[in-house]
Design a protein with these regions (language model features):
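Conserved AMP-binding/adenylate-forming core of the ANL superfamily
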Residues: 1-19, 118-146, 150-153
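Short, aromatic/basic amphipathic alpha-helical patches
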Residues: 43-48, 75-83, 160-165, 184-189
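AMP-binding/adenylate-forming
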Residues: 54, 61-71, 132-142, 146-203
């Protein structure tokens, strides 16, 4: 499932947004910023980095930038006014489409769903480079054991942490610290059969 959606997103970024369809030589968008759920952020950021896109921390878009969001509010409106591309993606699991007016944005799930399930573009750069860029100089604070770990979501380096653990053959449980209180961590680790414990990253 994960590989299918990573491929769909990578195909969309390259074939729909970064393609020079008319051979004009004009600059194509290669910058993206998101306000999504952690699991959605992970997929978008890993796919974008693998295709050479820049992940923006700023909320000041330029024409041609891509903004993917769960909320169509003033931020999305400002991005559209600037000339950025805006995709609306529902926050709920198992959603198939955006439920409500799009107000100039595009339905993110509908756009992605039309893409092939396998890469139809040139092989992306090695994921090692994408991982290292996403980790921004951080590393696990202690040796990691087990086959399944938990990570506290960090908006800046979370996607890199997930990719780092995936590349070492581990499955990952993403915990949003804004939605889960610390006293529930032990229960979550047990319920999710996390044998590698909670992994933290630091410089």
């Amino acid at each position: 499932m994960v590989s299918r959606w990573l491929a769909k997103i990578a195909n969309y970024l390259t074939n729909e947004l970064a393609a020079d369809l008319f051979g004009t030589g004009e600059a194509t968008p290669t910058r993206i910023y998101t306000t999504l759920q952690p699991w959605q952020d992970t997929l978008w950021q890993i796919a974008a980095r693998a295709m050479g896109w820049e992940i923006l921390d700023t909320r000041r878009p330029l024409p041609g930038d891509l903004f993917v969001t769960n909320i169509l509010g003033s931020e999305a409106s400002d991005a559209l006014d600037t000339g950025a591309h805006v995709l609306a993606q529902p926050a709920q699991y198992l959603s198939f489409a955006w439920d409500g007016p799009l107000d100039g944005a595009l339905d993110g799930l509908a756009e992605i769903a039309m893409q092939p399930d396998a890469l139809v573009i040139d092989t992306p750069p090695l994921l090692v480079q994408a991982r290292d860029e996403a980790l921004a100089g951080t590393r696990p604070s202690a040796p990691v054991q087990g086959s399944r770990v938990a990570l506290l979501w960090d908006a800046r380096t979370g996607a890199g942490q997930v990719l780092d653990q995936w590349m070492q053959g581990r499955s990952v449980v993403i915990i949003d610290p804004h939605a889960v209180s610390p006293d529930r961590l032990t229960q979550i680790l047990a319920t999710e059969d996390v044998d590698g414990g909670l992994v933290t990253y630091q410089r």
